[in-house]
């Protein structure tokens, strides 16, 4: 690594593969020594080949049993990485969220399950979950995973009598249409974070205070029919 200090104009470095016993610490040291160079190093994640110059990691439906630890290690040496797809890899939502939070500039996607039978990828833009007879009745516990779906623009979780908490919408800043009617929630505070919201149905809920909606400047349609305790 020290000799690289004498090669300031080097633009490309080929390191071979991890089968050469060159560890991640050495790869990182070389990258740090030559910040302007493209450093190519071939490695394997869960029996699939990748390179440090790749822009994507696709592990969709490949079992991952270490909570994504190897992925995190590799991501630290992939400066051009744009996206990581870990759909149905068996990693917990908490571990996947930790990966996403550690690399906010990388699109990290996985699959979440909610209700009894609903599942979506975290990059989904449209969620329809208003048929308890099909996907199960939503409640505050089995709907919590929806908070990981931060790209949602259209959300329909109406007709869920047991849904008494909509905290998950606070994590949906792109939300434009929300159908939250005929549920059992009372606190509209999470909606204050949905500044792109244009259409909102919340009729026949237990909401008592609309003040959290005061900052929603793009809101054009609001249905509050049959809310009997509204101040």
Model-derived features: positions:
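Intrinsic low-complexity tandem-repeat regions in disordered proteins
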Residues: 24-27, 96
């Amino acid at each position: 690594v020290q000799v690289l200090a004498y090669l300031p104009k080097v633009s490309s470095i080929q390191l071979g593969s991890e089968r050469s016993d060159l560890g991640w610490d050495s790869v990182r040291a070389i990258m740090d020594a030559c910040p302007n160079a493209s450093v190519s190093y071939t490695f394997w994640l869960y029996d699939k080949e990748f390179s440090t110059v790749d822009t994507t990691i696709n592990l969709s439906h490949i079992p991952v049993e270490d909570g994504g630890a190897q992925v995190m290690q590799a991501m630290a040496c992939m400066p051009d990485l744009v996206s990581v797809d870990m759909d149905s890899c068996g990693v917990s939502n908490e571990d996947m969220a930790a990966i996403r939070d550690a690399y906010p500039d990388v699109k990290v996607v996985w699959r979440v399950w909610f209700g009894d039978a609903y599942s979506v990828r975290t990059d989904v833009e449209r969620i329809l979950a208003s048929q308890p007879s099909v996907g199960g009745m939503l409640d505050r516990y089995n709907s919590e995973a929806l908070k990981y779906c931060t790209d949602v623009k259209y959300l329909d979780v109406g007709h869920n009598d047991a849904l008494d908490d909509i905290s998950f919408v606070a994590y949906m800043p792109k939300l434009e249409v929300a159908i939250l009617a005929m549920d059992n929630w009372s606190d509209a505070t999470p909606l204050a974070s949905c500044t792109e919201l244009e259409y909102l149905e919340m009729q026949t809920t237990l909401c008592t205070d609309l003040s959290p909606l005061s900052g929603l400047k793009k809101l054009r349609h609001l249905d509050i029919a049959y809310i009997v305790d509204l101040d």
